[in-house]
Amino acid sequence: MLQVLLEIKHQVKQASYVHETELNDAQLLVGNLGLRHRRGLREHPHVYDLGEEWNRWTNLPFVFARWVLRNDIEPGNALVIEDSLFTSLQDWSDGLYRVSGPAIPLPIHPQEIHMYTQGLRYFMGRPEEKSVIQFQEYLDKLR
């Protein structure tokens, strides 16, 4: 997504990617590292959330991942898997605020956890499908 945003949205064609230990103008931080430094780094104080940048640009949510099943899965088994996913999602959200402490220590306030998790969507609707199609079209332009 970073390449799409840089090259297509911002017309930055000469971006080069270097190791984090090399001199750089910016860093891409993901996962726990991204959450840990969500307010920026001393040497890089400006923060851009890629999902937020995509949404501002396209007015669509970005689909970072999705669950898919093979076509040859029997319908009954597919329903069991779907039900398991929904149950796990409910258990996760129910237990989110009952945890005695984070599994991975991150300096993050419960209100920030709430705001972060409220932005997550676990269902594919029309906007999400449109977003996947739009992203694929942009990827095709980069080839």
Segments (PLM) and residue ranges:
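Generic solvent-exposed, charged/amphipathic alpha-helical segments
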Residues: 3-7, 86, 136
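Ligand-binding cleft/hinge of the Venus flytrap
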Residues: 1-16, 97
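An extracytoplasmic/periplasmic, membrane-proximal ligand-sensing/linker region
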Residues: 98-143
